[in-house]
Amino acid sequence: MKEALDIEVHGIVQGVGFRPFIYKIARRHLINGWVLNATAGVFIHAEGESKDIDDFVMEISDNAPAASRVDEILMKEVPLEDFESFTIRYSDEAAAEATTLVSPDLATCDECAAELFDPANRRYHYPFINCTNCGPRFTIINKLPYDRKYTSMAAFPMCEQCATEYADPEDRRFHAQPDACFECGPHLIWRTVDHSANAQEDLERVKAEESSFAENGTAKEGCIAPFGVDLKASDAIIDAAVRILREGGIIAVKGLGGFHLACDARNREALATLRARKHRGTKPLAAMYPTLDALREDCLVGNAEERLITGAQRPIVLLKKRVGAHFAEGLADGLSELGAMLPYTPLQHLLLAAFGGPLVMTSGNLHDEPIQTDDDKAFVVLHDIADAFVGNNRPIRCRFDDSVVRVIKAGSAGEAVQMVRRARGYAPMPVPLKCKAEKNDAQSVIFAAGPEQKNTFCLLRGEKAFVSQHIGDLENAPTYDAWLEAKSHYEALFEAQPESIACDLHPEYLASKWAATAHENGTPLCKVQHHHAHIAAVMAENDLDEAVIGVAFDGTGYGADGAIWGGEVMLCNRTDYERFANFSYLPLPGGAAAIKNPLRMAYAALWQYDLLDHPAAARVVESLGEAADVCDRMIERGINCPMTSSAGRLLDAVSALLGICEQPTYEGEAAILLEAAAEPSSESYEIALVKNTATEQSTAHDTSVVLLDAEPLFRALLDDMQADVPVTIMAAKAHNAMIAAIVQSCLVANAAYGISIVALAGGVFMNRFITEGAIAALEGAGFTVALGKELPPNDGAISYGQAAVAAARANQQAS
């Protein structure tokens, strides 16, 4: 019996070959009707025999394109219209809301990579080859629906051959919006740098050369043509870039979401030059390898890591260095892991294949500023760093850094992917957030402004949380401007104007100041404590509504009492929290100065615990010199000396005390090197649990029941130092003490309140030793452990947690 269905498919269904997929399976199942790409999703009218329609719908669910994500299939029986065939219709531009999910950018697929290196293919060595299964998506889109005219490809009318492919439902490039070739598409732009010239004047020079070339079609004698408009010119640009790289130079290379700075990953001098020019310090650099086999020579790649590093997202994956492999000084010194990735754009494939070895690929930006996306601006900003630029004339609409992930042992769950930085390949795919009451408007929008460091923002619409790509640290005007730019882009693209706002408690954060201004203009505001947001994020990702014990260990977060928190054990639900336990407060002499100089933190701990007279403490006092007296005065007088309960600062103090890292050059370095120094050991120092006798505080938000006292840890550490215990053992004992403190405080909370679920969050859980150890120990003690899934444990998840709390409080008020 024949029947007809109207079918709506919601999810990542645009720009991923979904309509040709529907077209092909409809023909296979003898279905007539049509498929339409609309702003709300993909609409299908299907007519056929009942069994054929059932099989058709089943295949939509089971065999959707790999780059797609089907979140929901809605079906409604409708009258037969007796269509005689199945067709693909054009987009419905009259749809009211932009609810379709936009695909992230996708790595070059195997088929396109094969064509890229096939001399018989018309796109041989074309640096922008793509199809419906790969290529740019979110970084080129201006508005929905995802059609070429609404992307940065609108400036490139297709040639006859590309247009034929684009219109053929049987072709892999059917409605591939970025489809192009040498004849009609974007091309490379080659610019060399005169380091003796002013950046702006040098830009005028290269633009004059480009103008001259455009007029007469020839470059200066002995010079590379500035535009790679054909195979010969494009290959010449690749060859020129490779020559500079082999000579130890630095190339700025335009990618999907911005520029990279590239140099030879095996050249110590090149790495030193890059670090000096970029003021990079000792922060580890990521390397891009030409092939998986080449990567395996240097790093251990398990099955889970291989799936990540070869998948469509192509993130940077943190991999264990292979014992005996040679790594150039300056790449990732002192660490057991290397951030590695494979090429994910055609240009990168060409560059890496021609170079024949790994290249450093680090973000093309100045220190603490956003990645550069515009060719002219990048030339000026990166002028003193790069020796040449490989840009292009395809505009980037939204800047994106590379994502960073790792694989950890997650106890009974086995191996799990831990997000470190969520950006290209993952955003803007929404993270589910099931906390909206049914009576609330499913399309109401909450905007969560996020934290100061590792900022993301979040647009919560219904149960879809659009967490932005990694923005960075909102401590300067350029990054704040990038935050505003990305916020406006998301709101316009998804037609989502916030009806309420969530932000951090800290009054001086730029994002919080923006939220306060919006509140003054009438928008409801929900302020969320930093560590509550951390735990709420884990709860929401795991769809937990019942109370949990939340362990939020990190470097800093504004506390309800005005102190700097960071070693918190909380009793949490979605709407509120009680502070159950925390590390005893330590002074931060000089505030930010103590964060940047762990020796100050070590001195403060020894001062607080009356251990400065211990013989092993002398080295800290000597290393600080006159600053020791300054620290003394600040601590004694309470001047410029905030108090902190931060677990991260404790690890910094231990690192400095052991001489592992006294002067870090990047955030987290002291703790990272402490972890790298630790060898597996069952020995542990002690962190004592004592009853909090403080009476000044009066609310559950700032008064804990239990204090975690690190005095025994530091006393035993000094004794071990005096006894010449190996640093590797002392580092392990400090880590094990942290793990034991987590378990013991959770056991005490469980005994008092009966809560058996523990949520772990905060930057300290970027530490593999502590994370894997805590999971194993907690599960061994009978707890269920919840971790972040799609979002990182660090501050990259804060905006999502803020949105979860704001939504839960709104539901509570409405009920």
Regions found by a protein language model. Name each.
Residues 1-182, 186-189:
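Intrinsically disordered, low-complexity, mixed-charge
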Residues 63, 69, 150, 165, ...:
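Internal gly/pro-rich beta-alpha loop/helix module
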Residues 296-301, 350, 371-378, 402-403, ...:
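Conserved phosphate-binding catalytic cores of ATP/NTP-utilizing and phosphoryl-transfer enzymes
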